[in-house]
């Protein structure tokens, strides 16, 4: 075999000679742009069909009947995987927690909103060991209710029912999570190449963004302590960083840990080397189950999971104050589990504080705490909070109920998306509430009149388009946050973001507010227009005018109905996570990053739920409309600015231009006429990628063709309309 026929990175040669086998393009060229993540979860992989609407099916569901079935399941112990203490509650709480607990605030990805625990890599993470059994236990219920109940909803609901069946009163439940049917390829879980690797820190323990978990394959932190070092104070620092990146403050963190660990037990009774492969690596006859243990029967009291062993409380299947009671009642001594994991045992434990053996109630065994648990007492911030909860059980119960609800619903977006009879009435700040529409909406005639007023105001096309884009493009399809509804672009922190060019933004908002106030003052009835609507309408009017200048009479769709949120309804710290580090659509980067600008464009496009053609046509259109950050000339490949032409593509593809880098980092470029040597254009990597990448060039060639101008305008308007309405869940 010649060296040329081997992969230059892995050294591998072609594998099985079947369709889809052999070396992939990414094996040969590992730095390929990940465009495939823009085309995930299409109708081609979804067996439900394009007409399926889960929201309508869920409305048919008898939620009470489902919960009754789940309550019955909790104590219906199965021989193939018997329930600890005769109750599956602890297992289902862990399943729901680990489904929701992958969420991180930085990019909104992860979480329990898609049922992704069914697929790799999550279904095979070490921290999810034996949760495959929990999902198999749920299958008869999923089978019974079919398309009316998604796996994503069922897993979270099972966690709620587990808590309720053990005496805890939950805060509520909102359905509406839609299942995916293939693994998510857009989520960066880390660069480690082995399970439990921790090559994600720099400096004195600076965790890489956007990650939240401390090691590959863990949901949160290492329960034995940082990198297995049993130091509770150091563990507290890891816990604080990780939970903060998952949207939890200190009080919520303590409530979740103490509340969740009131139930169930850990499993580490034998040799961890006897545990078989995870589901994705297990043999076909295991039928998707993994971690088959060769220690004894491999189940019941001989179960192996985390390597830790024991319950936290003397009564692991009832809600009580046992966790905090044990935490403060005893001093704790470092020991090792039978599997060799670091854990802590209570000194001189009283008989009444022993727990029953999980599968033999006649036996009593000691409880345990992990290093992470002891951080709830020994950390200087967590300790006083834990003590207060211990002394005030009602506060603790309320805090846990609210934190659990937040954990399991944080990635669902606004409350308007929640379904079912158990949705709490209370609005919560982390839900990014916007006021309900309490006025008559503007008519088509009034929309046309307002467009004329906006264009007559003297506000230039680039500023109107830029403001509308800045408002709407904060949306993240990952956790359904952001968007134009609420007009939060006028509030902190968005009004101060560099990318939004605050001085220009305030000038535009001031003019739009005057138009709004004048219009609303002219109305004799209850009709009004919100600033949120007017911001989007201004962008639409500007796009129409730019198209008219190019010779195209188009109407950009507009649907009124947005309202204006207040600063009190806006969590400044939470919204800070939505600030763009880079926005290739505006040719903006806050600073230089370890990833390329074109990769960040793909990332942002994926969050905006854009396809590669939509991304391409938007970049080309926005360049000629002139919305670049600080009016940069990069990528403005036109002699007719503020006119909606396909000039970006025509000039990018012109072989009469030769491009050369003008920066050492190869991030800015100059295009010169091949014959005269005269400079023609300047560009960034985000601009040139549409001529460099073969797949993007193929799309660019469509829009750069002589007959493409009308198609370009049509497609740009459609993609623009999509972005403007991404958060209009009332329209979908």
Curated annotation (Swiss-Prot):
What is the top EC class of this enzyme, as a single word? oxidoreductase
Question: For this protein, what reaction is catalysed?
Answer: H2O2 + AH2 = A + 2 H2O; 2 H2O2 = O2 + 2 H2O
Enzyme Commission number(s) from the entry: 1.11.1.21
GO biological process per UniProt: cellular response to hydrogen peroxide; hydrogen peroxide catabolic process
Where does the record place the catalytic residues? 98
Q: How is it modified after translation?
A: Formation of the three residue Trp-Tyr-Met cross-link is important for the catalase, but not the peroxidase activity of the enzyme.
Q: Which UniProt keywords apply?
A: Heme, Hydrogen peroxide, Iron, Metal-binding, Oxidoreductase, Peroxidase
- What CDD domains does the database record attribute to this sequence? catalase_peroxidase_1, catalase_peroxidase_2
Covalent cross-link Tryptophyl-tyrosyl-methioninium (Trp-Tyr) (with M-246) as placed by the record, residue numbers: 97-220
- Site positions for Transition state stabilizer, renumbered to this chain? 94
* Co-factor(s): heme b
Which region ranges are annotated with the description Disordered? 1-23
Q: Which GO terms describe its cellular component?
A: cytosol
**Source organism's superkingdom?**
Bacteria
Q: Where does heme b bind?
A: 261
Q: Name one Pfam family in it.
A: peroxidase
The UniProt feature for the cross-link Tryptophyl-tyrosyl-methioninium (Tyr-Met) (with W-97) gives its location as 220-246
Q: Copy out the cofactor comment.
A: Binds 1 heme b (iron(II)-protoporphyrin IX) group per dimer.
Q: Which GO terms describe its molecular function?
A: catalase activity; heme binding; metal ion binding
Q: Which InterPro entries match?
A: Catalase_peroxidase, Haem_peroxidase, Haem_peroxidase_sf, Peroxidases_AS, Peroxidases_heam-ligand_BS
Q: Which family does it belong to?
A: Belongs to the peroxidase family. Peroxidase/catalase subfamily.
For this protein, the record's NCBIfam families field holds: cat_per_HPI, PRK15061.1
Tell me the function of this protein: Bifunctional enzyme with both catalase and broad-spectrum peroxidase activity.
Quaternary data: Homodimer or homotetramer.
Q: What is this protein called?
A: Catalase-peroxidase
- Native source organism of the sequence: Chlorobium limicola (strain DSM 245 / NBRC 103803 / 6330)
Q: What is the lineage of its organism?
A: Bacteria, Pseudomonadati, Chlorobiota, Chlorobiia, Chlorobiales
């Amino acid at each position: 075999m010649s060296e040329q026929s081997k992969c230059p990175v892995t050294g591998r040669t072609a594998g099985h000679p079947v369709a889809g086998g052999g070396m992939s393009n990414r094996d040969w060229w590992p730095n390929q742009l990940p465009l495939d993540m823009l085309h995930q979860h299409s109708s081609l992989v979804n067996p439900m069909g394009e007409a399926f609407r889960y929201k309508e099916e869920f409305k048919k569901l008898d939620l009470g009947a489902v919960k009754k079935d789940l309550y019955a399941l909790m104590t219906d112990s199965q021989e193939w995987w018997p329930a600890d203490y005769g109750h599956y509650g602890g297992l289902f709480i862990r399943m729901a927690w680990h489904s929701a607990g992958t969420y991180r605030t930085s990019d909104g990805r992860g979480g329990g909103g898609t049922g992704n625990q069914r697929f790799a890599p999550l279904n095979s993470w070490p921290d999810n060991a034996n949760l495959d059994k929990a999902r198999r236990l749920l299958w008869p219920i999923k089978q019974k209710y079919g398309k009316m109940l998604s796996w994503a909803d069922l897993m979270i609901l099972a966690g709620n029912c587990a808590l309720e069946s053990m005496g805890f009163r939950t805060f509520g439940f909102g359905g509406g999570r839609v299942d995916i049917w293939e693994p998510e390829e857009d989520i960066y879980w880390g660069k480690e190449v082995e399970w439990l690797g921790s090559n994600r820190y720099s400096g004195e323990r600076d965790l890489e963004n956007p990650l939240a978990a401390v090691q590959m394959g863990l949901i949160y932190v290492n329960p034995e302590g940082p990198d297995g070092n049993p130091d509770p104070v150091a563990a507290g620092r890891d816990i604080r960083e990780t939970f903060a990146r998952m949207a939890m403050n200190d009080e919520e963190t303590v409530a979740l840990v103490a509340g969740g660990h009131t139930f169930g037990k850990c499993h580490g009774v034998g040799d961890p080397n006897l545990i078989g492969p995870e589901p994705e690596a297990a043999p076909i006859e295991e039928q998707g189950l993994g971690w088959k243990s060769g220690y004894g029967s491999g189940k019941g009291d001989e179960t192996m999971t985390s390597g830790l062993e024991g319950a936290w409380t003397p009564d692991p299947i009832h809600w009580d104050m046992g966790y905090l009671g044990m935490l403060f009642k005893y001093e704790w001594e470092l020991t090792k589990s039978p599997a060799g994991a670091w854990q802590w045992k209570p000194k001189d434990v009283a008989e009444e504080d022993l727990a029953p053996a999980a599968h033999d109630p006649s036996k009593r065994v000691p409880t345990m705490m992990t290093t992470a648990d002891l951080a709830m007492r020994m950390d200087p911030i967590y300790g006083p909070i834990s003590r207060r909860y211990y002394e005030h059980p009602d506060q603790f119960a309320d805090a846990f109920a609210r934190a659990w609800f937040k954990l399991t619903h944080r990635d669902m977006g606004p409350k308007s998306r929640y379904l079912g009879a158990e949705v709490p009435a209370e609005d919560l700040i982390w839900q990014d509430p916007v006021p309900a529409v309490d006025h008559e909406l503007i008519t088509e005639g009034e929309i046309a009149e307002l467009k004329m007023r906006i264009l007559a105001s003297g506000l230039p096309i680039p500023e109107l388009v830029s403001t509308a884009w800045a408002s709407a493009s904060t949306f993240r399809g990952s956790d359904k946050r952001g968007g134009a509804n609420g007009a939060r672009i006028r509030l902190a922190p968005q009004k101060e973001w560099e990318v939004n060019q605050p001085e220009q933004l305030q000038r535009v908002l001031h003019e739009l507010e005057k138009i709004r106030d004048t219009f609303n003052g002219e109305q004799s009835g209850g009709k009004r227009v919100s600033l949120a609507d007017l911001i989007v309408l201004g962008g639409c009017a500007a796009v129409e005018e730019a198209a008219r200048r190019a010779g195209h009479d188009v109407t950009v769709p507009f649907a009124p109905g947005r309202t204006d949120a207040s600063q009190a309804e806006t969590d400044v710290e939470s919204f800070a996570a939505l600030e763009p580090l880079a926005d290739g659509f505006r040719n903006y980067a806050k600073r230089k990053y370890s990833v390329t600008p074109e990769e960040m464009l793909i990332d942002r496009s994926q969050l905006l739920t854009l396809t590669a053609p939509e991304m391409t046509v938007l970049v080309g259109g926005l360049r000629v409309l002139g919305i670049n950050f600080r009016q940069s000339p990069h990528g403005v490949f036109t002699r007719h600015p503020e006119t909606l032409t396909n000039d970006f593509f025509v000039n990018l593809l012109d072989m009469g231009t030769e491009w050369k880098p003008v920066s050492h980092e190869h991030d800015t470029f100059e295009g010169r006429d091949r014959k005269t040597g005269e400079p023609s254009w300047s560009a960034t990597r985000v601009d040139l990628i549409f001529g460099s990448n073969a797949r993007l060039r193929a799309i660019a060639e469509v829009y750069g063709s002589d007959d493409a101008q009308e198609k370009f305008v049509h497609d740009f308007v459609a993609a623009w309309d999509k972005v403007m309405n991404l958060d209009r869940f009332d329209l979908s």
